[in-house]
Amino acid sequence: MKKYLIIAFLLMALVTSCVSTRNTIRNIDDTAIMPPLSKEKTFIVTEISSDKKYGYDQDYPVNLGFLPITIAEMNVKRFFGALSGPEGQQITYTKVDSCCPFPSKKNDMGAGILDIYEVTWEGLATPKRIYINLYEKGKVIAPHGFGIRQIVP
């Protein structure tokens, strides 16, 4: 019996330690609306961030939580499809990690996580790491140092 109690206690401690008790994300905006889509099914992004933390810092991720989490991944493709390198270079992106659990009412589990993507383009010496939040909403703009791809609305 003691053995089961110890195992149950350890499991409970593990589960509760995985989620931060407070949300540190600073740029959530529940009133934000999903950007319009181009004919190519990418977001139409019209602004580049002047904030050097936007997208690069876990407290200021790109918030793409406009769809149910089960299909929200398509917003990643829509977002990166709207971006270019600073001189119009084509970008490539790869999901490399997930991190930074935070409390969220947008998930049955009561928590969300951030996904980390490495982005590169021709001439870029070191890939850029961009934090993406698929659970919460926010204004969608290009991170500092990126360009906006010329697309047909």
What are these regions (language model features)?
Residues 6-10:
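Sec-dependent N-terminal signal peptides
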Residues 61-98:
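Short, non-transmembrane alpha-helical segments in secretory-pathway proteins
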Residues 41-68:
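Post-signal-peptide N-terminal segment of Sec-exported extracytoplasmic proteins
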Residues 1-4:
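Positively charged n-region of N-terminal signal peptides that target proteins for export
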Residues 27-46:
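Post-signal peptide N-terminal segment of mature Sec-exported envelope proteins
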Residues 19-22:
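Bacterial signal peptide processing site
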Residues 106-151:
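Short, compact, well-ordered microdomains
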Residues 15-17:
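C-terminal motif of bacterial Sec signal peptides marking the signal peptidase cleavage site
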